[in-house]
Swiss-Prot record:
Pfam families, per database record: Trp_syntA
Organism of origin: Salmonella paratyphi A (strain AKU_12601)
Keyword Lyase among UniProt keywords: yes
Gene: trpA
Function: The alpha subunit is responsible for the aldol cleavage of indoleglycerol phosphate to indole and glyceraldehyde 3-phosphate.
The protein, known as: Tryptophan synthase alpha chain
Biological or metabolic pathway of the protein: Amino-acid biosynthesis; L-tryptophan biosynthesis; L-tryptophan from chorismate: step 5/5
GO cellular component, one term: cytosol
Length: 268
């Protein structure tokens, strides 16, 4: 959790936002996936949001569903994902690493064992996409026992009650949805959410990162101008992977230039 606090303090001092890319671990295979993650960090990513392949990712649109399928096709298992996470942490000791999960994967070997394993490999946060705040007690309690930040989603139509719960239970950062629906660059993020960001700050929530439909530098700078601590982009990045499956070096070059441009926009 401290890695998030340190990151946001440093960015605050520099008056810039965070740019956080999302990819699925093991897409399109373990070796290339590790190269992709190194490239994202080298190009300026401030933190990572990583998915563990899951057969029924409800919150995700077709782009990220396909990433899951490619990782499955490569034979990637949750155990291998944890091995990858340990390697990433060893190589990049200070970057915050977040997991985006579904409850079934957390339940598999028991909730406590899951968070213990996260702590062991150096994960900083876990967002369980299909567990609403009001059902989150066993997850967030296990997370905090193991020094893992529980992350909560703040939808654009959140009422005051939900905002207070998200602020009270969340740690690390708050995942602020640009809009409802599923992930996807083809569904561009709506207008910046000034009012929600102000409310979250008023309730002392963890810093808000805006996600869903973030696919251009303009959207990153708009999120930061609206008061968000930064932006998360997933589908736009995964599309670059999908488009370049036959040319791994071209894939890395395009990822590098996309992330550099998105990061530059966070300084606007």
């Amino acid at each position: 959790m401290e890695r998030y606090e340190n990151l946001f303090a440093q960015l605050n001092d520099r008056r810039e936002g965070a740019f956080v890319p999302f990819v699925t671990l093991g897409d399109p295979g373990i070796e290339q996936s590790l190269k992709i993650i190194d490239t994202l960090i080298d190009a300026g990513a401030n933190a990572l949001e990583l998915g563990v392949p899951f057969s029924d990712p409800l919150a995700d649109g077709p782009t990220i569903q396909n990433a899951n399928l490619r990782a499955f096709a490569a034979g990637v298992t949750p155990a291998q994902c944890f091995e990858m996470l340990a390697l990433i942490r060893e190589k990049h000791p200070t970057i915050p690493i977040g997991l985006l999960m579904y409850a079934n994967l957390v339940f598999n070997n028991g909730i406590d064992a899951f968070y213990a394993r996260c702590e062991q490999v150096g994960v900083d946060s876990v967002l369980v996409a299909d567990v609403p705040v009001e059902e989150s007690a066993p997850f967030r309690q296990a997370a905090l026992r193991h020094n893992i930040a529980p992350i909560f989603i703040c939808p654009p139509n959140a009422d005051d009650d939900l905002l207070r719960q998200v602020a009270s239970y969340g740690r690390g950062y708050t995942y602020l949805l640009s809009r409802s629906g599923v992930t996807g660059a083809e569904n561009r993020g709506a207008l910046p959410l000034h009012h929600l960001i102000e409310k979250l700050k008023e309730y002392h929530a963890a810093p808000a990162l805006q996600g869903f439909g973030i696919s251009s530098p303009e959207q990153v700078s708009a999120a930061v101008r609206a008061g968000a601590a930064g932006a998360i982009s997933g589908s736009a990045i995964v599309k670059i992977i999908e488009k370049n499956l036959a040319s791994p070096e071209q894939m890395l070059a395009e990822l590098r230039s996309f992330v550099s441009a998105m990061k530059a926009a966070s300084r606007a």
